[in-house]
A protein has these predicted regions:
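Short amphipathic alpha-helix that is part of the acyltransferase structural core
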Residues: 284-315
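Glycine-rich loop at the start of a catalytic domain that most often binds anionic cofactors/ligands
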Residues: 38-44, 68-77
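Glycine-rich phosphate/pyrophosphate-binding loops
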Residues: 197-215, 258-259
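Ligand-binding beta-strand-loop-alpha-helix segment within the catalytic cores
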Residues: 71-169
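Active-site rim helix/loop that mediates acceptor-substrate recognition in acyltransferases
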Residues: 308-334
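N-terminal glycine-/serine-/threonine-rich phosphate-binding loop
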Residues: 1-58
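Structural motif
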Residues: 24-28, 57, 137, 167-174, ...
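Polyanion-binding loop/helix "lid" in catalytic or ligand-binding cores
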Residues: 86-117, 155-156, 169-195, 218-267
Length: 337
């Protein structure tokens, strides 16, 4: 990127930087994303978000890592209703896999080598018993044993860490009041955390990325569209992503983003460009048309200047626009700020 392009790009991202600063984002990083070769870049981009003043809670998955650990121990497990049936023997492998995966994430976020994206970052990553879990129990005649689900999120404790400027890292293992350990679905944890914190965004990062139809990326989805796709999908991973997004968005989370871990820079592109890179899900993504105000003058000038340079429009001064602002209407895009 040459200097002029870099300066232009930086200027274009500045409204997003201002808008995101101080906001709470919950990021769900799938085990497949952690196993992907682009993982270290994704984690460095997450660290960059923290340095820009975004309050982050990162929840990681570990399904491929658990599968590998189980295979090494010659332990077979089965799935039902998209959940792993976890017996006591398998639970030991789950703890080992989740623990080692968490250490990989923490080590990447602790880097600070000169001439690296992490130089000078000095992130504080914290963990704790921020949630209580309960057993899934018996469903449709199937005993899920040590597989659990979220009972409660301690939003106040998480908020205290965010106020201190820490990044909160949560793993998909929860504990009951009696000290039992349960294997949890990381997407379910992420949805519960985002809802409890009243987060502005829930971002699901996985190899699946955005939702595709006939080879085309669906950039925006409403809740009814998400529900319809979820019911009709035959892809388990896609169903899981859509179910998580639907639950979060239907319970107060403003926006849910589905982002690919395989595309370098996809997370930053999704958050800091108008086009994005994945699928954005909102409760209502209709456009709003309203009368322009004096505060819109700068934005209108930015929009019409290229057309004035091409002599498509007659050139207007700022003073003239301010005088005639009542004659203008603006279309507010949901993807806009």
């Amino acid at each position: 990127m040459n200097t002029d392009s870099y300066v232009q790009f930086f200027r274009q991202t500045s409204p997003y930087i201002h808008a995101h600063r101080g906001k709470t984002f919950v990021i769900a990083l799938g085990g497949d994303a952690i196993a992907h070769g682009n993982c270290h870049r994704t984690l460095h981009d997450i660290a960059l978000l923290q340095s820009l003043g975004i309050r982050l809670v990162l929840i990681h998955g570990a399904r491929p890592q658990i599968d590998k650990r189980l295979a090494l121990s010659s332990i077979d497990t089965s799935f039902a209703q998209q959940l792993r049936i976890t017996d006591s023997e398998a639970m030991l492998c789950v703890k080992e896999a989740v623990g080692s995966t968490r250490l990989i994430i923490e080590s990447e976020l602790s880097m600070g080598l000169p001439n690296s994206p992490m130089h000078g970052a000095q992130l504080t990553v914290v963990g704790g018993n921020f949630m209580a879990a309960k057993p899934v129990g018996v469903r449709n005649g199937i005993d899920f044993q040590n597989t659990g689900e979220v009972r409660r999120i301690d939003a106040d404790a998480i908020e205290q860490q965010l106020v201190l400027g820490s990044m909160v890292l949560m793993s998909p293992i929860g504990f009951s009041p009696t000290g039992e350990s349960f294997n949890l679905n990381y997407q379910d944890v992420a949805a519960h955390v985002a809802i409890a914190l009243d987060a502005e965004k829930l971002i699901l990062v996985s190899q699946a990325g955005g939702i595709m139809t006939d080879g085309n990326l669906l950039r925006n989805l409403s809740l009814p569209e998400v529900n319809r796709l979820k019911e009709n999908s035959t892809n388990g991973s896609e169903q899981s992503l859509l179910a998580c997004a639907y639950r979060a968005c239907n319970n107060g989370v403003d926006r849910v983003h589905l982002v690919s871990c395989a595309e370098d820079g996809a997370l930053l592109s999704e958050l800091f460009t108008r086009e994005g890179s994945g699928t954005l899900i909102m409760k209502d993504h209709s456009e709003v048309i309203r009368p322009a105000t004096i505060d819109d003058v700068g934005g209108i000038l930015d929009l019409i200047s290229p057309l004035e340079d091409q002599q498509v429009l007659v050139k207007r001064s700022r003073e003239l626009l301010e005088t005639e602002i009542s004659r203008f209407m603006v279309v507010v895009h949901p993807e806009g700020l």
